[in-house]
């Protein structure tokens, strides 16, 4: 019995499509899309962001957490 391989759906970086050069830590609406319901950062293999923008998102989320704009944990 032969198994068929699933074709992986190629996810495109939404931030590249929006042509963002900088991810602002004050944009909590955008940053909350990259967080789980418990407040953890979603990895790039699930979000589809490129490595450059994933690093920017990571730094922006950590800055927003330190400023008190985003929670560390959601209970």
Curated annotation (Swiss-Prot):
UniProt GO MF annotations? small ribosomal subunit rRNA binding; structural constituent of ribosome
PROSITE patterns according to UniProt? RIBOSOMAL_S18
Residue ranges spanning the membrane: these are none
Q: Give the UniProt record's GO annotations in the biological process aspect.
A: translation
Q: Which cysteines are joined by disulfide bonds?
A: none
Is Ribosomal protein tagged as a keyword? yes
Superkingdom to which the source organism belongs: Bacteria
Q: Which InterPro entries match?
A: Ribosomal_bS18, Ribosomal_bS18_CS, Ribosomal_bS18_sf
| A GO-annotated cellular component | cytosolic small ribosomal subunit
Q: Which UniProt keywords apply?
A: Ribonucleoprotein, Ribosomal protein, RNA-binding, rRNA-binding
Q: Member of which family?
A: Belongs to the bacterial ribosomal protein bS18 family.
Quaternary structure? Part of the 30S ribosomal subunit. Forms a tight heterodimer with protein bS6.
Described function:
Binds as a heterodimer with protein bS6 to the central domain of the 16S rRNA, where it helps stabilize the platform of the 30S subunit.
From the Swiss-Prot or TrEMBL record, give the protein name: Small ribosomal subunit protein bS18
């Amino acid at each position: 019995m032969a198994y068929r391989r699933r074709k992986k759906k190629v996810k495109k970086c939404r931030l590249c499509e929006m042509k963002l050069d900088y991810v602002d830590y004050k944009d909590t609406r955008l940053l909350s899309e990259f967080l789980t319901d418990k407040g953890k950062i979603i990895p790039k293999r699930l979000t589809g962001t490129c490595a450059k923008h994933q690093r920017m998102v990571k730094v922006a989320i950590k800055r927003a957490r330190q400023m008190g704009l985003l929670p560390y944990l959601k209970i």
